[in-house]
Amino acid sequence: MSRPESNFWQYLKKNTPNISWTRIENTSALGTPDLLGYNKYKVFFTVELKVAKRNIKFSPHQISFHVKHPVNSFILVKTPDACGLKLYEGLRIRELVACGLELDACGLGLDACRLKLESL
């Protein structure tokens, strides 16, 4: 995890106390998302963290993971614009690669993203 993504992880952990997070540091299974989350409804989900100014960069392995695991997988992007955070469902990974941050997100801002993940 890069330094900006590490800082992003700390921010997310601090501001989502109702989600139990496990940071995944896996070098053997390429493309595995950064985080495993668990909410009060006993639902597991994965989150790939990205910090992006314009284009979001994904490895082929990351794309493959979300294509193979489209349910309860998410990409959370920290952006420099006013909303700050954008949450995308993993099943839209190909659209996200093609359209970048112009793609409509399923959550905009910390509160909307947090509520989406807490209510799965």
Map each language-model feature to its residues.
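Nucleic-acid nuclease catalytic cores
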Residues: 68-94
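Acidic-basic catalytic patches of nuclease active cores, encompassing PD-(D/E)XK
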Residues: 1-26, 40
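Conserved catalytic cores of phosphodiester-cleaving nucleases, focusing on short active-site segments
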Residues: 35-37, 42-53
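Positively charged, low-complexity terminal tracts
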Residues: 118-120
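Short, charged, amphipathic alpha-helix that recurs within catalytic cores of restriction-modification
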Residues: 52-78
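Beta-rich catalytic cores
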Residues: 31
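Long, intrinsically disordered low-complexity tandem-repeat segments
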Residues: 98-115
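Structural signal for conserved beta-strand scaffold positions within catalytic alpha/beta enzyme cores
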Residues: 23, 48, 75-77
